[in-house]
């Protein structure tokens, strides 16, 4: 029910704002090229692109089904974002085994502004998040073939999935001590990743397609170029944000800003700000500290609790690696991939508090109400509604949000 209602929020007025928003200019263009050429082109010449094709193929599917317009560009992201809410709840049920905490997980996912914004924008990160959650859910269910396939699709969306692949396979090896299974999963996920480049293999127009004597060698050469781009990306951007600031939403990314007429005031504002619901994320920062402490205690006691371990694994894989790229240009919205696991950490904190003293249910309820009100307050700048400049300015709590 929560996922269904969230889907409505994601598709309602999905064509707003008009035109290409932020990096949609790259990914929608790439999706159009896939439909026309099978690969990405620039003025009828091969185009150097730095992300794998899966997410762009999903955007292309939306365009094919619904048309080459804003709704068609964004519908795949809206579906993916709605599914992340459902999948986070499924994972919560597997690790908490209690419908109350499952419901709370789904509700908090639905009340996160970052998830809403990313679900209404044709970028790749929401697809990465979807496949990571599908992989984790499959792993917890013991469906190892699905686990491998979804890991491959995650890597085929964005390379940052590799951190999840490494950590999850190491965890599988440590917990089950089955090296053969881990190798099979790794090989299968790698094969799925390579297969995701099928458009490049079957076309003579792909970038570096014929730079070497055979397609595999050419793809390896191309990947070296992609790696060079990613490791050398240090160009300054007005909305780049150090990972230290992500949890508190210190520098959210403005995807769109205009000053149109139509709000009834002298000056109007229309913005799409990729920011998490502030109160939710601030509680998440506290919950992460708690989560680390509980895991350290369990490690010292040699205890294993998936309800404690899974949220930490997700946050570590999705968040920690970015601290090692202090000179690289990065953005707060990259946090969407570990957002479900941060919410699981919040739910874990609520669960511990309630089990310690049932009276904490009143505090938990109050926190949910405050998060919901915070979400509603920021809703206009999550969805690009036209509001007065004063109303917009009132929502810029920190100067770094402008």
Describe each PLM feature range:
Residues 16-37, 185, 189-249, 387-396:
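Aromatic-rich transmembrane-lumenal/periplasmic boundary elements in polytopic membrane proteins
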Residues 2-6, 105-110, 137, 151, ...:
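Short helix- or helix-capping micro-motifs
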Residues 170, 180-185, 189-194, 198-208, ...:
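Transmembrane helical bundles and short interhelical boundary loops of multi-pass, membrane-embedded
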Residues 9-15, 25-57, 61-64, 224:
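Extracytosolic helix-loop segments that constitute the early lumenal/periplasmic catalytic or substrate-binding loops
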Residues 4, 71, 75-96, 134, ...:
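Transmembrane-helix motifs of polytopic, lipid-linked glycan transferases
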Residues 20-21, 77, 114-125:
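Short acidic/glycine- and proline-prone juxtamembrane loop motifs at membrane-interface regions
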Residues 2, 79, 88-111, 144-146:
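Transmembrane-helix signature of polytopic, membrane-embedded enzymes
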Residues 87, 108, 127-146, 150-151, ...:
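Specific aromatic-rich, kink-prone transmembrane helix
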